[in-house]
Curated annotation (Swiss-Prot):
Distribution of this protein across tissues and organs: Widely expressed with highest levels in bone marrow. High levels also found in heart, brain, kidney and skeletal muscle. Lower levels in liver, lung and thymus.
Chief location category: cytoplasm
Purpose of the protein: Thiol-specific peroxidase that catalyzes the reduction of hydrogen peroxide and organic hydroperoxides to water and alcohols, respectively. Plays a role in cell protection against oxidative stress by detoxifying peroxides and as sensor of hydrogen peroxide-mediated signaling events. Might participate in the signaling cascades of growth factors and tumor necrosis factor-alpha by regulating the intracellular concentrations of H(2)O(2).
Modified residues (N6-acetyllysine): 196
Key word Disulfide bond present: yes
Catalytic reactions of this protein: a hydroperoxide + [thioredoxin]-dithiol = an alcohol + [thioredoxin]-disulfide + H2O
GO MF term list: peroxidase activity; selenium binding; thioredoxin peroxidase activity
Positions of the Thioredoxin domain: 6-164
Note: The active site is a conserved redox-active cysteine residue, the peroxidatic cysteine (C(P)), which makes the nucleophilic attack on the peroxide substrate. The peroxide oxidizes the C(P)-SH to cysteine sulfenic acid (C(P)-SOH), which then reacts with another cysteine residue, the resolving cysteine (C(R)), to form a disulfide bridge. The disulfide is subsequently reduced by an appropriate electron donor to complete the catalytic cycle. In this typical 2-Cys peroxiredoxin, C(R) is provided by the other dimeric subunit to form an intersubunit disulfide.
Residues the record lists as Phosphoserine modifications: 11, 112
Organism for this UniProt entry: Mus musculus
Protein name, entry field: Peroxiredoxin-2
A GO term from the CC aspect: cytosol
């Protein structure tokens, strides 16, 4: 895996890429999403096996993310033409069908390299997922090996948790979901949470 420039707590590396959006080609810049959260996920290749399950799941939940002020962007090293061909392939035949999220082309592999997910020996991306906040700061990174897909529900939960901490200044314990108790991040006040949950 390549070492990249993406670091937690730092500005996410900006980029410009050609994407397929609603069946058409469009130039997308990360900086265009300033003011919104972004879930940026990398996947290995078009016309494969685990990848469509992830992309379709993110697409099917795009509105759930948008309700949180968050956009989802998918990226692979394939061209925009390959993305479009895959989108135009019916789901029953291993295709994607119409999508509610953009798919970005990274044919130069610069995005994958910059975000540290490039599998150099194969020239494809690992399954990297990055949560970028409304200020453009990278808040979360996970990278899966190729054979295991990611959880859209967990990505949604993480966005909700980061947004909660941004707004309220409290911290979210393991498995936190909206409406659950949080912790006041100081020695004395945190005891309220621990006495209730232990």
């Amino acid at each position: 895996m390549a070492s990249g420039n993406a670091q937690i707590g730092k500005s996410a590396p900006d980029f410009t890429a050609t994407a397929v959006v609603d069946g058409a080609f469009k130039e997308i810049k990360l900086s265009d999403y300033r003011g919104k959260y972004v879930v940026l996920f990398f996947y290995p290749l078009d016309f494969t096996f685990v990848c469509p399950t992830e992309i379709i799941a993110f697409s099917d939940h795009a509105e759930d993310f948008r309700k949180l002020g968050c956009e989802v962007l998918g990226v692979s090293v394939d061209s925009q033409f390959t993305h479009l061909a895959w989108i135009n392939t019916p789901r029953k035949e291993g295709g994607l069908g119409p999508l509610n999220i953009p798919l970005l082309a990274d044919v130069t592999k610069s995005l994958s390299q910059n975000y540290g997910v490039l599998k150099n020996d194969e020239g494809i991306a690992y399954r990297g997922l990055f949560i970028i906040d409304a200020k453009g700061v990278l808040r979360q990174i996970t990278v899966n090996d190729l054979p295991v897909g990611r959880s859209v529900d967990e990505a949604l939960r993480l966005v909700q948790a980061f947004q909660y901490t941004d707004e309220h200044g409290e911290v979210c314990p393991a498995g936190w979901k909206p409406g659950s108790d949080t912790i006041k991040p100081n020695v004395d006040d945190s005891k309220e949470y621990f006495s209730k949950h232990n």
